[in-house]
Amino acid sequence: MFKGAGVAIVTPFKEGKIDFAAFEKLIDFHLENNTQALIVLGTTGEASTQTMEEREALIRLAVQRVEGRIPVIVGTGSNCTDTALQYTRQAEDLGADGILVVTPYYNKCTQKGLIEHFTQIANATKLPVILYNVPSRTGVNILPETVATMSKVENVIGIKEAGGNTAQVLEIKRLVPEDFKIYSGNDDQIIPIYACGGHGVISVASNVIPKEIQEMCAAFMEGNVEKALEIQLLYKKFIDLLFCEVNPIPVKAAVSALGYIENELRLPLTPMEEVNRKKLMDEMKKQNII
């Protein structure tokens, strides 16, 4: 689907509504800075707080603005299979290039339930499907054997692995076909996931430093591990601060500091604590990001 750095793009809000003008500017920012894919309506995009109508407008704008230059991948997961199917059909109808499907959250289903859930969604679309494992948020871990089962479904082409367990990533790599894509879901594990046979990252940090994250990925893919590691280490503290409060609270503060968006979230998310915001701003100044 893509190799390198895709951005899990934030959704800008202004006075409670989506700021579409700001969203266009963000897309242009990523096109100018070599981002390899646009992931819309994911965790970082606050998808769970948006209506069907808002989703439609956001997807439509992303597809139109990108004009096929990079893949537009839409988060269509839900803890209700029927709702996930509706989101998936909507994304396909609006011209998305692929979908990202998170494990059902709160329900805490079995591995059998995961397989049936993902299979129904994959069978309902011609789009490439990327599974999304983030057990810290969902309460459910996709086991490597389950990933291997799903990899046999023709249009299930990869996984965003945000479990933080490199041993699990290695086991997935051992079990799946060679062309099955493994993307890091954690910015602090880009190099480790590459070393486990990964193909890139679906990145939060790319909202702020897209050029640098893609340079890190490109360096590793070109065999320059030393340069890739140098970039990973250079921005380690910044990346840590992006997750000192729950995502996307810090990254929205960071993108706001760049001047692209208002620092606005939808409840139940609230703005960053001032003590943490100051640490983030200080590090951004230190790294000449602002």
From Swiss-Prot:
- The answer on whether this UniProt entry bears the keyword Lyase reads yes
Q: Name one GO cellular component term.
A: cytosol
Question: Per UniProt, what is one GO molecular function of this protein?
Answer: 4-hydroxy-tetrahydrodipicolinate synthase activity
**Site positions for Part of a proton relay during catalysis:** T43, Y106
Q: Which reactions does this protein catalyse?
A: L-aspartate 4-semialdehyde + pyruvate = (2S,4S)-4-hydroxy-2,3,4,5-tetrahydrodipicolinate + H2O + H(+)
Q: Which residues form the active site?
A: Y132 (proton donor/acceptor), K160 (schiff-base intermediate with substrate)
Q: In which pathway does it act?
A: Amino-acid biosynthesis; L-lysine biosynthesis via DAP pathway; (S)-tetrahydrodipicolinate from L-aspartate: step 3/4
Keyword Lyase on entry: yes
Known EC number(s)? Answer: 4.3.3.7
Q: In which compartments does the protein localize? A: Cytoplasm
Quote the record's binding site residues for pyruvate: T44, I202
Q: Tell me, which GO biological process terms does this entry list?
A: diaminopimelate biosynthetic process; lysine biosynthetic process via diaminopimelate
What is the predominant subcellular site recorded for this chain?
cytoplasm
State the HAMAP family in the record: DapA
By sequence similarity, the record places it as follows:
Belongs to the DapA family.
Oligomeric and partner information: Homotetramer; dimer of dimers.
Give the protein's function: Catalyzes the condensation of (S)-aspartate-beta-semialdehyde [(S)-ASA] and pyruvate to 4-hydroxy-tetrahydrodipicolinate (HTPA).
- From the Swiss-Prot or TrEMBL record, give the protein name: 4-hydroxy-tetrahydrodipicolinate synthase
Native organism is: Alkaliphilus oremlandii (strain OhILAs) (Clostridium oremlandii (strain OhILAs))
Question: What is this organism's lineage?
Answer: Bacteria, Bacillati, Bacillota, Clostridia, Peptostreptococcales
Gene expressing this chain: dapA
